């Protein structure tokens, strides 16, 4: 591995992303595919690029990402979290800006479990008065 490579792990819902950052030309590879190829939705691509655009390093760093589990939205969020952590390892002075934007905090929201006697997590069976 290259000596000037920075790593960050990101998680969101049931997705986990491993992000490797190194100086380059702004190339982003997700699971051996380009960002545009991997994420069809423009929203997901925007979410992934947010931390880089905030610190204005979009054209200066190459990203290699592997992501597993969950769906498209969760994976995009996990990659964003991983990029944020890798950027902080790359340059600690970026932390306040990333923190202010809310990218450092892990979004702890996940699916609530189904309870016994209910149809879903909170949906009760229909009540019949008589």
Swiss-Prot record:
One of its GO terms (molecular function) is structural constituent of ribosome. Gene3D superfamilies: 3.30.230.10. GO terms for cellular component: cytosolic small ribosomal subunit. The keyword Nuclease does not apply. The keyword Ribonucleoprotein applies. Keywords: Ribonucleoprotein, Ribosomal protein. Transmembrane segments: none annotated. It holds the Pfam family Ribosomal_S9. GO terms for biological process: translation. SUPFAM superfamilies: Ribosomal protein S5 domain 2-like (SSF54211). It comes from the Bacteria. Belongs to the universal ribosomal protein uS9 family. This is Small ribosomal subunit protein uS9. It comes from Vibrio parahaemolyticus serotype O3:K6 (strain RIMD 2210633). The gene is rpsI.
């Amino acid at each position: 591995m290259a000596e000037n490579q920075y790593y960050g792990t990101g998680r969101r819902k049931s997705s986990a992303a491993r992000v490797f950052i190194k100086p380059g030309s702004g190339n982003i590879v997700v699971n051996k595919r380009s960002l545009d190829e991997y994420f069809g939705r423009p929203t997901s691509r925007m979410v992934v690029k947010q931390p880089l655009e905030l610190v204005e390093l979009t054209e200066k760093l190459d990203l290699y990402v592997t992501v597993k589990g969950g769906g498209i939205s969760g994976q995009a969020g996990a990659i964003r979290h991983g990029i944020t952590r890798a950027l902080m390892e790359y340059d600690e002075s970026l932390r306040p800006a990333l923190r202010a934007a809310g990218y450092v905090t892990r979004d702890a929201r996940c699916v609530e479990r189904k309870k016994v006697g209910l149809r879903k997590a909170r949906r009760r069976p229909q009540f019949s008065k008589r």
